[in-house]
Swiss-Prot record:
CDD domains associated with the record: Ribosomal_L22 (cd00336)
Subunit organization: Part of the 50S ribosomal subunit.
Native source species: Variovorax paradoxus (strain S110)
Protein name in the entry: Large ribosomal subunit protein uL22
Classification via PANTHER family: CHLOROPLAST 50S RIBOSOMAL PROTEIN L22-RELATED (PTHR13501), LARGE RIBOSOMAL SUBUNIT PROTEIN UL22M (PTHR13501:SF8)
Domain of life: Bacteria
Disulfide bonding pattern of the chain: none
Keyword terms of this UniProt record: Ribonucleoprotein, Ribosomal protein, RNA-binding, rRNA-binding
Membrane-spanning segments: none
Gene assigned in the entry: rplV
Length: 110
């Protein structure tokens, strides 16, 4: 039983929004997971789909795995660094804008 993983770090996406999509495909077969992501209208779905496709390609190339038997073993989204920016407000003030990033980890296996 081999497991292969793919990682995407520093994605410009909120952790909560990424976890919503990750919960949809956890434990599913990879073809079913790709189908779910194809029809999920979220920015996170496009990002996670690319990471899942990378994990599938890694499993096929590095381990010689059969794609039809692969399942999404683990998928999790962790918080990354937050970019802090300022925007101008009235009367010479400024407000902070947080631009969160996250890291996406996908593991596929039999």
């Amino acid at each position: 039983m081999s497991e292969t993983r793919a990682v995407l770090r520093g994605v410009r996406l909120s952790v909560d929004k990424g976890r919503l999509v990750a919960d949809l495909i956890r434990g599913k077969k990879v073809d079913q997971a790709l189908n779910v992501l194809q029809f999920t209208q979220k920015k996170a779905a496009v990002i996670i789909k690319k990471v899942l496709e990378s994990a599938i390609a890694n499993a096929e190339h590095n381990d010689g795995a059969d794609i039809d038997e692969l399942k999404v073993k683990t998928i999790y989204v962790e918080q990354g660094a937050t970019l802090k920016r300022f925007t101008a407000r009235a009367k010479g003030r400024g407000n902070r804008i947080s631009k969160p990033t996250c890291h996406v980890y996908v593991t596929v296996g039999n």
